[in-house]
């Protein structure tokens, strides 16, 4: 897995986590 792909994967998973946190906070 190259760094660019890894970075994209981290961004995607981070965004999903952030959405989940916002949803739980409501």
Swiss-Prot record:
Pathway: Purine metabolism; IMP biosynthesis via salvage pathway; IMP from AMP: step 1/1. It catalyses: AMP + H2O + H(+) = IMP + NH4(+). The keyword Isomerase does not apply. Keywords: Hydrolase, Nucleotide metabolism. GO terms for biological process: IMP salvage. Its EC number is 3.5.4.6. The keyword Repeat does not apply. One of its GO terms (molecular function) is AMP deaminase activity. It is an enzyme of class 3 (hydrolase). AMP deaminase plays a critical role in energy metabolism. Homotetramer. Belongs to the metallo-dependent hydrolases superfamily. Adenosine and AMP deaminases family. This is AMP deaminase 1. The lineage of its organism: Eukaryota, Metazoa, Chordata, Craniata, Vertebrata.
């Amino acid at each position: 897995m190259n760094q660019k792909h890894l970075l994209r994967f981290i961004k995607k998973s981070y965004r999903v986590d952030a959405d989940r946190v916002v949803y739980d906070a409501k």
